[in-house]
Regions:
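Structural signal for conserved beta-strand scaffold positions within catalytic alpha/beta enzyme cores
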Residues: 11, 60, 163-165, 215, ...
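Local cysteine-cluster metal-coordination motifs and their immediate loop/turn environment
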Residues: 122, 196, 219-254
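FNR/FR-type flavoprotein reductase catalytic core
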Residues: 77-220
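Ferredoxin-reductase
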Residues: 2-87
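Short, basic/aromatic-enriched C-terminal tail that caps enzymatic domains
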Residues: 1-3, 246-264
């Protein structure tokens, strides 16, 4: 069972309307040896009425400072409680949780990163990790509602960055795949995180291009450790233990090979 750790807030600030950045530091001697891009943690609101952690993807990991950065949308009372914290406050955290992107499968390739909305933050850690791999070219296409964007400067340090906005106020008008087509982007592998309609389109596109795709699925989670079965997704293969075609996003995922999951 993953343990709960009391983390210290070292930085917290707004990035865009309704978007908050929070950096948390581990207590001495409690940091993990490794954090993979695409993993997440469960952050507990400082409110006794809200017992369940909020699953939030890891935006950045600083192994020297032992700090995790999270960027999240303020979507309800729980995330509003987290966003109200100040530097020096403490936040209880469950994790690190889940399976992330396998850098070894991507190293040495031309890799396309696609992030939509709150699927943008985990792409920063992935871009940073891939930029260290020899012979790896990283192209990041991030999608937003409008020109009130976030993390573009950060991601641009590690990748060739393109953006798409729904209203056309910045970059390509439309979605991330519209930007891919408009700019003639070709890749040898694609990694994506975002809303389900986007992931379905990415899977179809990757199949047409005959390139591997790795998808980070977004789903509501309760426990975060696979016990409640509240975040299952349909899989292509039957699970040898449960004998059903399901996988738990919080434990087997959130990152899956596109061929592993049936998302329509």
């Amino acid at each position: 069972m993953k343990k709960k750790t009391t983390m210290t807030v070292t930085d917290i600030r707004p990035l865009a309307e309704g978007i908050c950045s929070m950096t948390l530091r581990y207590p001495e001697g409690e940091a993990p040896e490794e954090v993979k891009p695409g993993q997440f943690a469960g952050l507990y609101p400082n409110d006794a009425d809200k017992l369940l952690p909020r699953p939030i993807s890891i935006c950045r990991w600083d192994p020297e400072k032992k700090e995790l950065r999270f960027v999240f949308r303020i979507a309800g009372a729980g995330t509003a409680s987290l966003a109200a914290q100040k530097a020096g406050d403490t936040v209880d955290m469950l994790g690190v949780l889940g399976n992330g992107y396998e850098i070894g499968l991507l190293a040495g390739k031309k890799v396309l990163l696609l992030g939509g909305g709150i699927g943008v933050p985990p792409m920063l850690e992935l871009a940073a990790a891939l930029s260290k791999e020899p012979g790896t070219e990283v192209i990041a296409v991030m999608g937003y509602r409008d020109s009130d964007m976030f993390l573009t400067d950060d991601i641009g340090k590690y990748a060739r960055l393109l953006v798409a906005t729904e209203d056309g106020s910045a970059g390509t008008k439309g979605n991330v795949l519209d930007a891919v087509r408009e700019n003639g982007v070709k890749a040898q592998a694609v990694c994506a995180c975002g809303p389900m309609p986007m992931l379905r389109a990415v899977k179809r596109s990757a199949m047409e291009e005959e390139i591997p795709a790795y998808l980070s699925l977004e789903e509501r989670m309760a426990c975060g450790v696979g016990a409640c079965l509240g975040c299952v997704t349909k899989t292509a293969k039957v699970d040898g233990h449960s004998h059903v075609r399901n996988a738990r996003i919080c434990t087997e995922g959130p990152v899956f090979g596109a061929e592993e999951v049936e998302i329509g």
